[in-house]
Amino acid sequence: MEENFYENEEKVDGYAEFTPTHDGTLLIDVLGEYLPEAAAVLELGMGPGKDFKKLSQRYRVTGSDFSQLFLQRYREQDPAADLLRLDARTLETDRTFDAIFSNKALIHLSSDELQQSFERQHELLNDNGLILHSLWFGEGERSFNDLTLVYHNEQDLTKMLETSFDIVALEKHAKMSDDDSIYVLARKK
């Protein structure tokens, strides 16, 4: 993961300005088809908190990020928010959830790190719990603004998830251009 990037105030400001209209409304609506209101949801990589706010309208949400700077900034807006500092690779918490959600937060993890994260997410989910994650669609890695972006396709994600999860939906969608993204919705076996 890109630890230093998200602790730099200038880069965090740039990130927030770069993504002003990119929120997870589509993803949250998909989750809403399968998850009852008031369920316990963990958001990974909440960043400036756009999706956290939307998720909070339906669910009991715990926001998380590895960036202390993002967490600090959100706490200034909402001191009562339930926030955790978590590394998406290891997810060191003893809390459990009905669903785990991320919108492009796991894009910096290598395939091995993503597999490790999925295994840990399985442990943190209650029975029949769900994951919903959006990632960049494609193959390989690319660099962007001092960050490494890892791309995934249907086959990669199916292989990583098939032993511990039943895949409910695996769909391409548009984030910045047609079919540049993929989301996976899966249920704990």
Regions found by a protein language model. Give the residues of each.
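Short catalytic micro-motifs in class I SAM-dependent methyltransferases
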Residues: 104-105
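Short alpha-helical functional segments enriched in proximate histidine and acidic residues
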Residues: 124
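A conserved beta-strand element that flanks and buttresses the S-adenosyl-L-methionine
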Residues: 101
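Class I (Rossmann-like) S-adenosyl-L-methionine-dependent methyltransferase catalytic domain
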Residues: 1-39, 46-92, 109-116, 120, ...
